[in-house]
Amino acid sequence: MDINASKVDPKLLELLVCPLTKGRLSYDPEANELVSEKARLAYPIRDGVPIMLVSEARKIED
């Protein structure tokens, strides 16, 4: 995978919020996901596009 393709634009990260909680997201570069700690969900990034659908998000387990 191209390393540059997996990076998230910091300006985009400032604008995006969790669709469930409207809270901030953090980027997990290892999993290539946007994480909502409050909702305990991780939204995938596919081909450089964040998939901001709760139905597509992975539940974060402890």
UniProtKB/Swiss-Prot annotation:
Q: Which GO terms describe its cellular component?
A: cytosol
| Pfam families (alphabetical) | Trm112p (PF03966)
Matching entries from InterPro entries are given as:
Trm112-like
Q: What PANTHER family does the record tag this protein with?
A: PROTEIN PREY, MITOCHONDRIAL, ZGC:162634
Question: Which family, according to UniProt?
Answer: Belongs to the UPF0434 family.
Q: What is this protein called?
A: UPF0434 protein R03186
List the taxonomic lineage: Bacteria, Pseudomonadati, Pseudomonadota, Alphaproteobacteria, Hyphomicrobiales
